Regions:
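Beta-strand-connecting loop/turn residues
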Residues: 37-40, 66, 97, 103-106, ...
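Short, ordered beta-strand-loop transition motifs
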Residues: 32-38, 134-137, 192-197, 214
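N-terminal leader/presequence regions that precede the main folded/catalytic core
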Residues: 1-76, 80-83
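Short, surface-exposed beta-strand/loop "edge" segments at domain boundaries and coil↔beta transitions
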Residues: 42-54, 152, 206-211, 227-231
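Surface-exposed beta-loop interaction hotspot
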Residues: 76-174, 178
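Short acidic, glycine-rich loop/turn motifs
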Residues: 45-47, 132-136, 203-205
Length: 280
């Protein structure tokens, strides 16, 4: 069986996670609340329309305690549907021997939540997340959000260039080739070889060639890169993080007290990148 570890999975989820969080940052969300009883994330959009979208509780980060706690441990007794994806992560961790997925608590570092969420997105196929204050010190709840309202636009050449360059500037991706391959798989783009150290992405409106340097890092993007100088360099400066959706920090991430309509039924469970790549 192919080797699988947390870093590999986090790299696999890095580009699509960066893309989806940038997309999510443009969605105006006010008066948000987490409705655990209905596995929903509720918010009001810029036009004053209220939405209830499917939410999956993944875990909590507690800087005060220095720990990450997986949602599958479910110390709060949340409904099974709300922690289903977290339990799926534990099952995959047991199946593929990924220890970070199978220990209820992990030692927290500044990078751990984003690393875990990138890996979670790779194995679940759900690629948008929301981080919410819980009202308990600096503890935050981490959720996957899954709804057509948040769907990404189709992948175009311009979008691929923007995603790759901004992701490289704003993430700590180790395996550029693996991250690009995973992004193409997740976004339905075709990836083929186009010469030594060059691959070609076939997208909705054309194709894009990507050159790798001797260390396997992305070194250039353009229409014709094989045997030619690098067309463009990923920016050296650090890209700014996408602005977080508006949310009142004082509001706790607790189930809504009032009765409310549940979100639309859950979509069919996605087959995550891990299973697709390993054929299981």
């Amino acid at each position: 069986m192919a080797e699988v570890d947390l870093v590999t999975l986090a790299d696999a989820g890095a580009f699509v996670s960066h893309e989806h969080q940038s997309h999510l940052a443009a969605v105006r969300m006010s008066d948000w609340r987490i409705d655990a009883a209905h596995s929903a994330f509720r918010f009001t959009d810029a036009e004053g329309v209220e939405h209830a979208i499917r939410a999956h509780f993944i875990g909590t980060s507690s800087p005060d305690d220095g720990t990450w706690l997986w949602g599958w441990d479910n110390i709060n007794g949340f409904p099974p549907a709300f922690v289903k994806q977290s339990e799926r992560i534990r099952a995959l961790g047991e199946r593929y021997a990924i220890p970070e997925f199978t220990h209820a608590t992990l030692v927290l570092s500044d990078e751990l939540p984003s690393t875990l969420m990138n890996a979670v997105k790779a194995v679940t196929g759900v690629t948008a997340h929301f981080s919410a204050p819980t009202g308990n010190g600096a503890t935050r709840a981490w959720l996957l959000l899954d709804d057509p309202l948040l769907a990404l636009p189709r992948p175009t050449v311009a979008r691929a260039v923007a995603v790759v360059t901004s992701a490289l500037a704003g993430t700590a991706t180790v395996d550029h080739r693996g991250a690009l391959t995973a992004w193409a798989e997740q976004r339905g783009a075709r990836l083929t070889g186009a010469g030594e150290d060059v691959v070609e992405l076939t997208l909705d409106d054309g194709s894009l060639q990507v050159r790798f340097d001797a260390a396997g890092r992305i070194a250039g993007l353009g229409k014709r890169l094989s045997g030619a100088p690098v067309a463009s360099e990923p920016p050296k400066e650090q890209a700014a993080e996408p602005a977080a959706p508006e949310r009142p920090e004082e509001q706790a991430a607790e189930p809504a007290a009032e009765a409310a309509e549940p979100p639309a039924p859950s979509p069919p469970e996605r087959r995550g990148l891990l299973q697709r790549l390993l054929g299981r």
